[in-house]
UniProtKB/Swiss-Prot annotation:
GO biological process entries: nucleosome assembly
Family the UniProt entry places it in: Belongs to the histone H1/H5 family.
Tissue expression summary: Sperm.
Protein name listed in UniProt: Histone H1, gonadal
Signal peptide: none
Pfam families in the record: Linker_histone
Keywords: Chromosome, DNA-binding, Nucleus
A molecular function GO annotation: structural constituent of chromatin
Region (Disordered): 1-40, 133-171
Length: 171
């Protein structure tokens, strides 16, 4: 029996090492701000209170049920936002707390008070705006008149040139 031939040991080729590439720097991802499917909580609360027209004010439970029904949002997720908004609005005077403390009890829409100084400022700014509008209208009218005069002059010039050409052509 013939013995199997031994192969000559071939020199092993080592795998080529590719030159090391510097790791790519990842640019920070810009997250798009997702817009909520509902208006701001403050607006929803004021709408709820206004819609219920309760004489003694609207309770937090009623406000929440109105928001859940009208805007179809998860009330459990909005609860902390509603509570914070109620407290802040009471503090600012936009809402009036009829009974209870903090974010509990009954709430009504508060009367927004304007000081005399702010009312005067508002009047002054309105008057300035009116004056500006009048000045703009006057300027525009003057421009229109000037443009019309230019057009008329150009047309007259053209007519005169045409007459002169006809007169030259006749003799």
């Amino acid at each position: 029996a013939a013995s199997p031939q031994k192969r000559a040991a071939s020199p092993r080729k080592s795998p080529k090492k590719s030159p090391r590439k510097s790791p790519k720097k990842k640019s920070p991802r810009k997250r798009k701000a997702r817009s909520a499917a509902h208006p701001p909580v403050i607006d929803m609360i004021t709408a709820a209170i206004a819609a219920q027209k309760e004489r003694r004010g609207s309770s937090v439970a009623k406000i929440q049920s109105y928001i859940a029904a009208k805007y179809r949002c998860d009330i459990n997720a909005l609860n902390p936002h509603i509570r914070r908004a109620l407290k802040n609005q009471v503090k600012s005077g936009a809402l009036k707390q009829v009974s209870g403390v903090g974010a509990t009890g009954r709430f009504r829409v508060g009367a927004v008070k304007r000081s005399a100084a702010s009312a005067n400022k508002l009047k002054a700014t309105r008057e300035k705006a009116r004056a500006r509008a009048k000045a703009k209208k006057a300027k525009a009218a003057a421009r229109r008149k000037a443009a019309a005069a230019k057009r008329k002059a150009a047309a007259a010039k053209r007519r005169a040139a045409k007459k002169a050409r006809k007169a030259k052509a006749k003799p």
